[in-house]
Amino acid sequence: MTAAVTAAAVKVEKLLHVRVPLRDGIHLDANVFHPVGGTRYPAILVRTPYGKGADFPPGYSSFIQHGYAVVLQDVRGRYGSEGLFDALNQEGPDGYDTLNWIAAQPWSDGKVGMIGGSYLGIAQWRVALLNNSHLKAIFPVVSGSDDYLDRFYSPGGAMKLGHRLLWLSQNLTPAGLPKPKFGSYIGHLPLRTSDTAATGRTLAIYQTILEHPTYDSFWKDLSVRENIDRVRVPVFAVGGWYDNYVESDLDAFAALHKPGKDDTKHRIMIGPWPHNMSSPFAGVGFGNDSGAPIRAYQIAWFDHWLKGAPEDAAHYTPWAWHSVRAEVDEAPMHIFVMGVNRWRDEREWPLARTHYTAFYLTSKGHANTGKGDGALVWNLGKKAKPDQFVYDPRD
């Protein structure tokens, strides 16, 4: 389907439900939007398991206004796309084939950038590892860089059962079946059938993660962080101090930015945000400057890497005491310091001038409940009572 609409002062050509062929014969469903005109445009690609939407999302208008095409695509096995959903393995090759398809379209100039958060950020990392020549830069947000530690297991091998089963239940319960309540499956035993309790069916992805409870070669091969040397495209990562994946985001940046590498093209920004990037968090505000113009950063980033925009490009918007343009071209780190509630530019992670402080766990013998008397203290006490509790995985 083809139609034209208007995004602000720019007319938009709409190509809805375009079938994108993959190497194995599967077709993915995509919506394409680009400025009306006879020229070719660089493209912004968004690949999502959550539904690309039925029409033109107003939130992408600024890309159209700045001369980009926007491609929104349902990943394999989700919504309008064919195939079986395989989150651990599909996004690299499917993204690679999609990039080739975009480059071959009459409205494309062959240059593509990718954006998106959480799973949509993982999809960017996956294809960035494959070094498709059409992918010029990525902008992953709250995505993390290691599936084992970010999404499935804690250090030491305890499964993040609630985190994972909730996501599976919310997203992979078949249409027509009611979504079970969290309490009905979080305590389900045996673990081998918890996927059925949560979604009404056996899931290959869940069975696979049960087979790999330790950080073995399976997880290392999947890990972005472990394979970061394969990433050649410029990366602008965004994380939140209250997000599950912030440590992993910082680890990926540190690996990209380590001495001896071509680290001048990578950036990271960490703000006082949880996974959904909202503020205030838990009722605590961090001042008027705690937000960030993410879309302005994205446009500046892609104007530079997809269009070769000069440093003095006039349309970059000043923000607080710095400019978006300067952030793209200069300091590799932009972090929000809570307490003083201001942004600060840095050039390495961990910070070389860090002074590490030890904290100690203590109690009066009753730190064994959610309302216990456990505390963090500055000094290690000479004597403390033990805390005891009975663990039963069935209760």
What do these predicted ranges mean?
Residues 186-192, 283-395:
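C-terminal, loop-rich substrate-recognition/catalytic regions characterized by aromatic stacking residues
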Residues 3-38:
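N-terminal cap/lid segment of alpha/beta-hydrolase-fold proteins
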Residues 247-266:
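Active-site-adjacent alpha-helix of alpha/beta-hydrolase-fold enzymes
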Residues 35-104, 146, 151-154, 159, ...:
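Cap/lid segment of the alpha/beta-hydrolase catalytic domain
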Residues 114-116, 141, 238:
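Short beta-strand immediately N-terminal to the catalytic nucleophile in serine-hydrolase-like folds
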Residues 65, 129-230, 312-313:
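Accessory cap/linker subdomain of secreted extracellular hydrolases
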Residues 231, 237-239:
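Short beta-strand/loop motif that positions the catalytic acidic residue
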Residues 106-119:
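Alpha/beta-hydrolase fold nucleophile elbow
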